[in-house]
């Protein structure tokens, strides 16, 4: 058959149309119930460390950049990052780099409007603090600490804990927990960021301590005009995540997968055999920027797990990284 330019043009047109239709079909809603597969433990703490935990992760230049907290063999907390790696199977051999100053329970993202990397954390000079950098791979290339939030909360043994930061087109939002059954929110105009959210916050969710414990994370759901929040809960069979959704970051949050038997992620649906706990971690994002965007067609959760037979001092429990992949 002789292929004329007209036929070729029509073929290319149809191919493009099919690709467009296929792309539209690929837009996924969040599932009504979740089922995952899990890796085993992906890395062992290096000598002198008892635990690797509280992970934050971005993909930059095709490589994972992971920061986290460490507990040493005396139960003291510090901070670290992994050397960049391309595939989760490479995490075990990636370097584990201690930070000179602690940035415990970190949140890492690229703030696009100012072309700067942000590392937000707790237990710094203020309730929450942040540092900036032009190179997120360098564990000790961060600026001096700056105030991110200076407020306090009541009815909490820990005080403010486990922040996350996310932005829309006009505002930046700070969400955090208190190990007390409450989730808190503060905001500022995006033009003022990076900066201090001040001293005021509002309670946006309230429940039992067990149901709203810590490790809150908030994400933009790609293509859905929706936001996803996950919060770590304490269950009869270990730590698990509950999920909530909202139509705007300043809006009301509605529980989505909220029970231990049907969680966002937990022993009931993780597929993990090496851990009962699915604890403090971070969904893998589409891009590293402040929108914290995740692809509902390809959800993965970097989490901390541990040997269920381990017991004793919480700060010495052998937490290690693992990854869940959503079954679709």
From Swiss-Prot:
Pfam families with a match to the protein in the record: Glyco_hydro_62
Catalytic activity: Hydrolysis of terminal non-reducing alpha-L-arabinofuranoside residues in alpha-L-arabinosides
CDD domains reported in the protein's UniProt record: GH62 (cd08987)
Taxonomy, superkingdom: Eukaryota
Keywords noted in UniProt: Carbohydrate metabolism, Glycoprotein, Glycosidase, Hydrolase, Polysaccharide degradation, Secreted, Signal, Xylan degradation
E.C. number: 3.2.1.55
Top-level class of the enzyme under EC nomenclature: hydrolase
Glycosylation sites recorded in the entry for this protein: 309
Molecular-function annotations in GO: alpha-L-arabinofuranosidase activity
Disulphide bridges, residue numbers: none
UniProt xrefs under InterPro entries: GH62_arabinosidase, Glyco_hydro_beta-prop_sf
UniProt similarity note: Belongs to the glycosyl hydrolase 62 family.
Function (record text): Alpha-L-arabinofuranosidase involved in the hydrolysis of xylan, a major structural heterogeneous polysaccharide found in plant biomass representing the second most abundant polysaccharide in the biosphere, after cellulose. Releases L-arabinose from arabinoxylan.
Name of the protein this chain belongs to: Probable alpha-L-arabinofuranosidase axhA
Origin organism lineage: Eukaryota, Fungi, Dikarya, Ascomycota, Pezizomycotina
Encoding gene, per UniProt annotation: axhA
